[in-house]
Amino acid sequence: GYMHSIVRNVNISNCVILDSNRSLCIMSSTDGIVENVTASNLRLDTRCRAGNWWGNGEAVCIMGTYHHLANYRDPVPQREAHACIRNVLLQNLNCTTENALAVVGENGSVENVHMDHLTVQLKDSENLCVKGRVIDISPAPNTARLPEEPTWLYLRGVRNVTVTNAFVAPFHGKTPIAYAEDAEGARF
């Protein structure tokens, strides 16, 4: 769904992704559409790398943020859809990650995301301080800054994101938090 394309009816299952700067990314500009995506039975392990790489150690990053490159080959289409990413099911994910799982939109541009049966284990990072405590939402012009507390889930600008049956392991003796801002209908 990068830039303005349309992606529908995607199924990702039974995958192992190890030592990745970002494991699972679903992204679209607000003028694209990504819908009806299921990802299940995944083992995701990330680490943040120094340098200018997309991703900042996120095991899951779903982002529907406006970005348009003036030199992109196609003009911005006029679409009627309110949400550019919708109807996503993430099920049976085992995540070992240096950063939070993230669902980031603008004004509800990401909606109806359900995560079920998650295991999340945060781990120490040598390089997270290089980019800062942020979710990498490149190429969007804005940022997604994390709270100072250990954070396992970051939601912003989304609608109807639900999490059920999640186990989040303690990190340095603390229970990581779930952070939500402008997240209508979020339940976790």
Across the structure, where does each feature detected by a protein language model lie?
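Extracellular/periplasmic carbohydrate-active domains that bind, remodel
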Residues: 1-188
